[in-house]
Design a protein with these regions (language model features):
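Alpha-helical solenoid repeat scaffolds of the TPR/TPR-like class and their adjacent stem/linker regions
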Residues: 1-563, 651
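Extended, charge-rich alpha-helical interface modules
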Residues: 564-693
Length: 693
């Protein structure tokens, strides 16, 4: 068998079994032969016979677990791995594969525990470090995942899967340069991997390198022609770059493959329209919405365009949009997805297939007139509620659905506090159009008094039809890339859209206007993530349009010079490794307690420091970081407790104990930092001096 003479070996083992042997090694080796040839059903049968002969055989239980997992029976596989570990607790391979089974089952906590058990027994196994990183990333901790991947790569530098996974984690953290480098390294080691080319293309696209991105997607498609993810990502990149002809064609891949990037909200029983739409057809056509509310608001206009061409059109849409659809004359009786599922007559088509059918492009917009309306009585209602407007009313909206941002719209939202330069203009009043996610920022906003007096009443209004009436009473809408942008744009309302540097495909990379909405003006980031510069431009544009009087500020000492102060640049100074990790853990704790602009600032600093640490590519002991973070968490709580005692004017023994615990915790903190510096050979070290008493 060792010489590869598999058939001969199998014949010998079967002859022994036919002769009546009851030897567990014979059955086990024959099972191994079957496994090498992918004959898992036979493998499982033979392993079970092996265990009947010798129940306390850990290797057989382990191999049975591998076979059961291969066949998709995760529960049975977990049982087999656990039996192997009962017989041999110090079995790192069993712990590792038990972690894999738990991961596939979705029990990430149990998976992490299993991987850690494996690493305690065999800390030099790169595969387990890589597997742990995958689960940590799934848990939403890309920083810890990056540490695990670096540990795997220190043990095995030419480990393509670890480089690939490292790229995924870097991309999730927004470090696109590092992600690109990791994907390229993975491709040097494994040049024929379509998934890596696809992910590299996405990282390049998000950096605005569209030609290189499309080249990467094409390489993925050369390796795997019917690769839905690469086709879909290529479509988005082409559309972003203005290649509408090829982009719309590839956009049809969105409903294919396991992921189904844009699943229709209903699957009617009638025939789905495929191929080019015949504009002379007599059969009714049902358009079925897909993706988000903003997509429906943007593309439902084409129901009107098709109806104008003589096609009998009906629309299935999200129920919360039905009153708006009716009032806008798009469909007097829109269907819910549940109703659309029962339609048997005519044909149906996903809504976002229509732009490709109509060959929509900047030179052929087909439909640019305002197409969204509200009810006149609702508009009058909000005229009365808002009352006499002493200043122009600016409707603002700052955040979209966080889940959508994770899926591919990263960076489109900004904090409410970023609107502070606008709020400083006393010639305007602000009106929040924010609903749901992000609306809690109103409670801690530094310019709360700048909102209209009826803001609380507006906050309670969730109906799109009524929101349209409120927008109708605004003089201008300023919004990030959310459904509100499409609602206001579809109404023909003057709208200023705030876009991050590489936005969603529909906005392109250049220009301050868009053919989708003639009433819209685009304000683009010049530097990725820099909303402050964008909002300064918006504030200047507001001043030109409505005039400005700055908000009064507290009197200050007169300046010593008339020269305009320059902003302080990032200060770069060497520090010890322990100090760097200490600062990172403090910022991680702050992210759990802060919100609004403060959270944005802390997250930016945290990302910068974590990137610095990751670039060192150290094989850090996670316990150092965990211990230091725990001490800083304890210090945070102690400070809260001390402030609480002081607020109550309580300076008893409890206060004294808490005060003493501060320096005790700081001594422990210094000791851990010194241990880190000593362990990793930091040039700078931790020193403390104590008052003798």
């Amino acid at each position: 068998m060792d010489q590869g003479r598999l058939q001969e070996a199998e014949s010998i083992y079967r002859e022994l079994i036919a002769a009546g042997t009851n030897n567990h090694i014979v059955y086990g080796n024959l099972a191994a032969l079957c496994g090498m040839q992918g004959r898992y059903s036979e493998l499982i049968k033979l392993l079970r016979r092996t265990l009947e002969i010798k129940p306390n055989y850990p290797e057989a239980h382990y191999n049975l677990g591998l076979a059961l997992k291969e066949q998709g029976d995760l529960t049975a596989a977990i049982t087999s791995y656990n039996k192997a570990l009962q017989l041999r607790p110090n079995y790192p391979e069993a712990h590792n594969n038990l972690g894999n089974a738990y991961k596939d089952q979705g029990d990430l906590t149990a998976a992490i525990a299993s991987y850690n058990s494996a690493l305690q027994l065999n800390p030099n196994d790169p595969e387990t470090h890589n597997n742990l990183g995958v689960v940590l990333k799934k848990q939403g901790d890309p920083t810890a995942a990056i540490t695990s991947y670096h540990q795997a790569l220190q043990l095995q530098p030419n480990y393509p899967e670890a480089h690939y996974n490292l790229g995924i984690a870097f991309k999730e953290k927004g470090d696109l340069t590092a992600a690109t480098a990791s994907y390229n390294k993975a491709l040097q080691l494994k040049p024929n991997d379509a998934d890596t080319y696809n992910n590299l293309g996405n990282a390049l696209k998000e950096q605005g390198e569209l030609t290189a991105a499309i080249d990467s997607f094409n390489k993925a498609l050369q390796l795997k022609p019917n690769f839905p993810d690469a086709q879909w990502n290529s479509a988005l990149t082409m559309l972003l770059g203005g290649d509408y002809k090829n982009g719309w064609e590839k956009y049809e891949w969105r409903t294919k493959g396991e992921k189904e990037h844009a699943k229709p909200h209903a699957i009617p029983k009638c025939k789905q329209r495929s191929g080019k739409l015949d504009l002379r057809q007599s059969d009714p056509l049902l358009l079925v919405t897909e993706q988000g509310l903003g997509d429906t608001l943007q593309f439902m206009r084409y129901a009107i365009a098709l109806r104008d061409k003589g096609i009998s059109i009906s629309l299935c849409a999200q129920p919360k949009l039905h009153p708006l659809i009716k009032a806008s004359g798009i469909d007097p009786s829109p269907l819910t997805p549940k109703q659309a599922n029962q339609v048997t007559e005519g044909e149906w088509m996903p809504l976002l297939s229509v732009p490709g059918q109509l060959e929509i492009s900047p030179s052929n917009p087909v439909f640019t007139n305002p197409y969204i309306n509200t009810k006149e009585d609702l508009t009058k209602k909000w005229v009365d509620i808002l009352g006499e407007k002493p200043h122009p009313v600016i409707g603002i909206n700052w955040q979209g659905n966080p889940q959508a941002e994770k899926a591919g719209l990263r960076g489109r939202s900004l904090a409410l506090e970023a609107f502070a330069p606008i709020a400083n203009n006393t010639h305007i009043s602000l009106l929040s159009l924010q609903k749901g996610f992000g609306s809690e920022q109103l409670d801690t906003c530094s310019f709360k008094e700048r909102f209209v007096s009826c803001q609380d009443q507006i906050n309670e209004t969730w109906d799109f039809l009524e929101t349209a009436a409120i927008i109708g009473n605004c003089d201008l809408v300023i919004t990030s890339d959310t459904a509100v942008a499409h609602l206001a744009g579809g109404m023909g309302k003057t709208t200023w859209l705030l876009l991050h540097k590489v936005p969603d495909w529909r906005w392109g990379l250049e220009g301050d206007t868009t053919f989708w909405y003639p009433s819209m003006r685009l304000f683009r980031q010049k530097d990725q993530g820099n909303w402050h510069e964008v909002m300064e431009r918006v504030a200047e544009a507001l001043q030109k349009q409505f005039g400005s009087t700055a908000m009064p500020t507290e009197p200050t000492s007169p300046p010593q010079t008339s020269a305009k102060p320059q902003p302080i640049q990032d200060i770069l100074a060497p520090i010890s490794l322990g100090e760097l990790i200490d600062k990172i853990t403090i910022l991680q704790i702050k992210t759990q307690h802060l919100q609004g602009a403060a959270l944005v600032n802390v997250q930016a600093e945290l990302n910068a420091l974590e990137t610095t640490l990751n670039n060192l590519q150290l094989n850090l002991d996670p316990t150092h970081i965990q211990r230091l973070k725990q001490v800083n968490q304890d210090l945070w709580q102690i400070e809260d407790d001390i402030r609480d005692q002081e607020r109550r004017n309580n300076f008893d023994e409890t206060f004294i104990r808490l005060a003493r615990s501060v320096y005790q915790q700081n001594d422990q903190r210094a000791a851990i930092k010194k241990e880190i510096n000593t362990t990793y050979g930091s040039v700078f070290v931790e020193e403390k001096s104590y008052q003798q008493y």
